[in-house]
C-alpha cells in the first residue's frame, strides 16, 4: 500500500508542478486529500489544477495498477473556478499524460471534458465531438402536437 501512495505522490507532484508554476510540493495525506505547498493558502483558481491533476493521477494509477477507480473521467467546465485561459489550456494539455502511462494501450479509458469554446490547444481540436454555439442547445424543447 505504501508503494502505491508513494507512486501516486510522485505522479501527482510532477503533474502539479507542470500545471502550476507556483507549486513546489504536492502529495496526498493520510486522509487521501491532496495537499499543495504544505497547506499554504492559494487563490481560488489554484483549485483547478489541484483537482484536475488529482483525478488525472487516479486515472493514471488505474491504468498502471488494479485499483478501485473507473478508467473514466468526466470534467465539467473547469474554467468556472476563475483560472485564466492560458493556464487552463496548459492544464488540459496534461490530460495526454494518461496515454504515456497506458503501456501498449492495454487498458481502454475515456476522458470527457466540457469547457468553453477554444479553451484547449490546437492539438485537441481533433478530439472535439460536439460544440454548442449560437442558438444551439444541448436540451431542446419538445413540442407535441395535440391530436383531437
Q: In which residue ranges do the predicted regions lie?
A:
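Conserved catalytic network of the ASCE P-loop NTPase/AAA+ motor domain
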Residues: 42, 64-67, 100-106
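Conserved ABC ATPase signature
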Residues: 33-55, 81-87
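Walker B catalytic acidic pair
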Residues: 76-78
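GG-anchored amphipathic helix commonly corresponding to the ABC/SMC/Rad50 NBD signature/C-loop
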Residues: 46-72
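C-terminal lobe/lid and adjacent interdomain/linker elements of RecA-like ASCE P-loop ATPase modules
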Residues: 91-148
Amino acid at each position: 500500500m505504501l508503494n502505491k501512495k508513494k507512486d501516486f505522490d510522485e505522479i501527482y507532484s510532477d503533474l502539479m508542478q507542470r500545471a502550476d508554476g507556483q507549486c513546489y510540493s504536492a502529495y496526498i495525506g493520510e486522509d487521501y486529500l491532496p495537499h499543495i505547498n504544505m497547506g499554504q493558502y492559494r487563490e481560488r483558481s489554484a483549485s483547478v489544477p489541484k483537482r484536475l491533476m488529482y483525478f488525472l493521477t487516479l486515472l493514471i494509477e488505474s491504468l498502471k495498477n488494479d485499483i478501485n477507480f473507473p478508467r473514466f473521467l468526466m470534467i465539467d467546465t473547469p474554467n468556472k473556478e476563475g483560472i485564466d485561459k492560458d493556464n487552463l489550456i496548459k492544464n488540459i494539455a496534461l490530460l495526454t499524460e494518461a496515454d504515456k502511462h497506458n503501456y501498449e494501450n492495454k487498458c481502454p479509458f475515456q476522458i470527457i471534458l466540457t469547457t468553453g469554446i477554444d479553451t484547449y490547444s490546437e492539438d485537441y481540436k481533433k478530439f472535439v465531438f460536439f460544440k454548442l454555439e449560437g442558438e444551439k442547445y444541448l436540451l431542446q424543447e419538445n413540442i407535441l402536437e395535440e391530436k383531437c
